[in-house]
């Protein structure tokens, strides 16, 4: 897979989280087999932790989000990966 795009339930610190272990394990397999790795999350997912942590932000190429993300939150998470 050249590029993978995964939706997530929460991003907290360097942790990428989802609602359940089965979904998280499947998403991790997809990301681990992609050359370029992206997650997609609207601004409400930042500083939010869901049930199962399945990936780390610093292992991703970027997080794709909406224009409503605050500059402070964007700056915080850009220390881990690109925030687009």
PLM region spans:
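Conserved phosphate- and dinucleotide-binding cores of soluble alpha/beta proteins
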Residues: 1-84
């Amino acid at each position: 897979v050249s590029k993978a795009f995964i939706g997530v339930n929460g991003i907290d610190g360097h942790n990428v989280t989802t609602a359940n272990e089965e979904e998280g394990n499947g998403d991790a397999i997809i990301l681990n087999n992609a050359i370029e790795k992206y997650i997609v999350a609207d601004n409400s997912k930042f500083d939010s932790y869901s049930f199962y942590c399945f990936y780390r932000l610093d292992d991703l190429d970027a997080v794709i989000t909406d224009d409503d993300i605050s500059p402070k939150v964007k700056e915080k998470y850009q220390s881990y990966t690109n925030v687009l």
